[in-house]
Amino acid sequence: MGTPVKILVVLFSVIVLLAVAQSSYLPPCEPVNETVAVEKEGCPKCLVLQTTICSGHCLTKEPVYKSPFSTVYQHVCTYRDVRYETVRLPDCPPGVDPHITYPVALSCDCSLCTMDTSDCTIESLQPDFCMSQREDFLVY
């Protein structure tokens, strides 16, 4: 093996080791405590509460060559097992159901994003964002 090839092999090895080392410092995909806001059309206040959501790093890869005949799938940290809890929103007028149900993450998984249950956008609102007046109510 010539000197340029040896240098490339060493350089490639260093890059691989750095990539592995960096990924070991990223938080894994797991349930974490988060403050979220729940609100409902017709009710004047939103409720801010504590729950668990899925958050963390999932290994992904992007192909160098993108064929028009293949699809690229990126895995995201999303819910595996959930429990649903229901709370009552304050000051809802008569005729508006004051109850709202929200998910509590029990376990998480790196898998394809399901838009029915997850926000998979690049930039979304913060989980505790309210359109209406806030009322803090901490639930664990």
From Swiss-Prot:
Heterodimer of an alpha and a beta chain. Gene3D superfamilies: Cystine-knot cytokines. The gene is cgbb. Disulfide bonds join C29-C77, C43-C92, C46-C130, C54-C108, C58-C110, C113-C120. One of its GO terms (molecular function) is hormone activity. Involved in gametogenesis and steroidogenesis. Keywords: Disulfide bond, Glycoprotein, Hormone, Secreted, Signal. Belongs to the glycoprotein hormones subunit beta family. It comes from Carassius auratus. It comes from the Eukaryota. The keyword Nuclease does not apply. It is found in: Secreted. Residues 1-23 form the signal peptide. This is Gonadotropin subunit beta-2. Glycans are attached at N33. GO terms for cellular component: cytoplasm; extracellular space. PANTHER family: GLYCOPROTEIN HORMONE BETA CHAIN, LUTROPIN SUBUNIT BETA. SUPFAM superfamilies: Cystine-knot cytokines (SSF57501). One of its GO terms (biological process) is G protein-coupled receptor signaling pathway.
